[in-house]
Amino acid sequence: MVVIGGAATVMTRHRGQSFAIWGTLGYFTVMEALQVAGYRVLDQCGTSSNQAVTLLSYLHIAFQPLFINAFAMELVPEPVKLRFRLWVFGLCAASSVIMLAQLIPAPAFGSCTPGSPLCGDALCTVSGNWHIAWDIPYNGLLVPVDAAFGTRFGFPSYMITVFVLPLLYGAWRFVLLHLVSGPILAWTLTNNPNEMPAVWCLFSIVIVLAGLSPFFRRSISSGTWWGVRV
């Protein structure tokens, strides 16, 4: 996957594609590299190398909404992208800040809910059912938000910016594809909430396909804003 992602990044940049396309491919290729690194330090909890890989993996996830939305906005009409992009990037940046704040070990915030994605007692990359899993001791800053919606996302700001925000500018085809090939597929392949995000990231190959294939990209693009010509 690292080789495929790297080749896709170089190819799309060579073709003159926008940074939103090849930059997103490159960013998710970094995640594949982090997963390879995770296997080299697997279950070595307490070591600086394992903790570094785990923390970098979390930080990568925290900033994914920026790249996912940059990619998704390439799939909608240019006037729509220009009208929404500042708000979109602002909200994605806010989500990233919130996810960074969830790492603050503040007793006042409490702790994450056991069974929520990535929730763990100590920072460590460990063995999942068949893939790697990440244990992150994040705080309970957003537990009340999850409780209000009756969910256990752990990171509701991420879910909103990745799956709800693109709907506002009309990238519904991409959202549907991402939902099916991401969390839904991941949950069918593992019941481990700490392994699921790593499996989800593993299948970022779908974004690679969308970046490489003009036909595939057209099939998930929208020529209107919810049926309205702009």
Question: For each of these PLM feature ranges, what is it?
Answer:
Residues 23-38, 184:
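Hydrophobic alpha-helical transmembrane segments of multi-pass membrane proteins
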Residues 165-230:
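C-terminal transmembrane-bundle signature of multipass membrane proteins
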Residues 1-4:
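Hydrophobic transmembrane alpha-helical segments in integral membrane proteins
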Residues 45-57, 113-117, 198-203:
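Non-cytosolic membrane-interface motifs at loop->transmembrane helix junctions
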Residues 21-28, 57, 88-92:
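Hydrophobic alpha-helical transmembrane segments of polytopic
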Residues 7-15, 71-80, 166-172, 212-217:
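Structural signal for the C-terminal ends of transmembrane alpha-helices
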Residues 6-10, 34-47, 58-90, 99-104:
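Internal transmembrane alpha-helix with an interfacial aromatic "cap," most often the third helix
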Residues 71-158:
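Membrane-proximal helix-loop-helix units in multi-pass membrane proteins
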